[in-house]
């Protein structure tokens, strides 16, 4: 393998141009290498503030940024989309949220070119008086959302931080009866898994009553002080439905297991417990991945990957997939095998056959060995979510591996360093 060198051809940054600017850069970065380097000439470009968060805040420090920027591909280019908020702590008669105050609006969509670093600021909420004031201060900085290219608009999604705030508020204010509200008789909570509050996650699914699948952001609720599930809430992101919030409640007389109850059932399952104990005895470390909560009809399917990392290994390896549905727990090598164990092999084969057909499949497929139902759209939802989690886990593992290598290199450098006093 050989190293491949390529010259930067973008318009990002600024030209070095002169010896004076070169000297100023050397002083700015406190190194003489810039001044005496033959590789840096008048046509060289200096790219500063390449971290997108730092870059954005240099321009709009008065905006609060979402914690989850996302990268999209549009018109052959890679661009970051950052959701930004206008916030205040002086809105009267409004509940305060830590870090955001008591007034929050997703007023701006920021688009950053990943190659050149150019930024565009689109006003997403023209009714927000704060962002309109800032627009009057900087009239050339902000653009109307209608000026955003149509292909880029298709990639816009509902921001996760705003949705978390709305879910937190709705957990209390969904109660409409004054007496019930005053006594907090039907208070909800965002569930916790492994002592950490669940974060909302994106998925593609067909909402109840809809005929097509769509991209949504979802979060479940549990009753206050209890572990069973009471409802789930979604934010829609597609087209004209963008920004619409929906809440679906489960019948109170029906027990729907919550995340912690499923975790307890997984840990109590004889097969799962035996396999984990066997791996632990061999000196390997068992890592339980992100728990996925996927609505299916009037119930839920839980999916959790199981990783195994050897003592000498760097990256965990996916070993098993655990699926929970109602009273059944299944652990298999693949998601398909675990679903087949719960719903029956015939149901999965029917779904697989319908995936190969161009026309719409039957609405439901019934397993001959089980009375449980699995829709093709439900199967695609589960499969898509699982693949997204696997991809994200792989990216995190690669980053962790690079960090470990950098730390080892730093340790070797420190060990070989000569300290002069």
Predicted regions and their residues:
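Soluble extracytoplasmic regions of secretory-pathway and membrane proteins
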Residues: 1-420
């Amino acid at each position: 393998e050989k190293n491949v060198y390529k010259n930067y051809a973008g318009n990002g940054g600024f030209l070095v141009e002169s010896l004076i600017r070169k000297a100023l850069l050397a002083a700015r970065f406190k190194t003489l290498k810039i001044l005496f380097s033959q590789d840096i000439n008048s046509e060289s470009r200096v790219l500063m503030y390449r971290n997108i968060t730092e870059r954005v805040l240099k321009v709009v420090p008065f905006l609060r940024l979402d914690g989850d920027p996302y990268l999209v591909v549009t018109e052959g280019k890679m661009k970051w989309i950052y959701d930004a908020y206008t916030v205040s702590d002086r809105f009267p008669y409004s509940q305060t949220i830590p870090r955001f105050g008591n007034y929050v609006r997703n007023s701006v969509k920021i688009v950053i070119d990943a190659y050149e670093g150019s930024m565009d600021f689109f006003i997403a909420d023209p009714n927000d008086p704060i962002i309109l004031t800032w627009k009057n201060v900087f009239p050339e900085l902000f653009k109307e959302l209608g000026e955003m290219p149509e292909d880029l608009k298709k990639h816009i999604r509902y921001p996760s931080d705003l949705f978390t705030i709305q879910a937190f508020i709705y957990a209390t204010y969904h109660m409409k009866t004054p007496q019930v509200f005053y006594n907090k008789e039907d208070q909800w909570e965002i569930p916790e898994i492994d002592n950490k509050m669940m974060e909302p996650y994106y998925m593609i699914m067909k909402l109840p009553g809809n005929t097509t699948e769509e991209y949504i952001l979802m979060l479940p609720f549990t009753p206050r002080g209890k572990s069973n599930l009471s409802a789930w809430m979604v934010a829609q992101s597609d087209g004209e439905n963008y920004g619409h919030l929906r809440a679906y409640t489960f019948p109170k007389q029906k027990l729907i297991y919550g995340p912690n109850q499923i975790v307890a059932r997984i840990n109590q399952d004889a097969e799962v417990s035996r396999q984990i104990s066997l791996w632990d005895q061999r000196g390997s470390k068992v890592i339980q991945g992100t728990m996925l909560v996927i609505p299916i009809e009037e119930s839920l399917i839980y999916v959790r990957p199981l990783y195994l990392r050897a003592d000498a290994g760097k990256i965990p390896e996916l070993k098993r997939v655990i699926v929970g549905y109602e009273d059944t727990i299944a652990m298999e090598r693949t998601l398909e095998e675990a679903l087949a164990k719960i719903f029956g092999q015939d149901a999965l084969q029917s779904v697989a056959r319908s995936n190969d057909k161009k026309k719409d499949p039957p609405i439901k497929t019934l397993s001959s060995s089980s009375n449980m139902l699995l829709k093709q759209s439900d199967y695609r939802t589960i499969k898509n979510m699982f693949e997204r989690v696997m991809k994200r886990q792989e990216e995190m593992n690669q980053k962790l591996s690079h960090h470990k290598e950098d730390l080892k290199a730093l340790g070797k450098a420190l060990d070989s360093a000569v300290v002069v006093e």
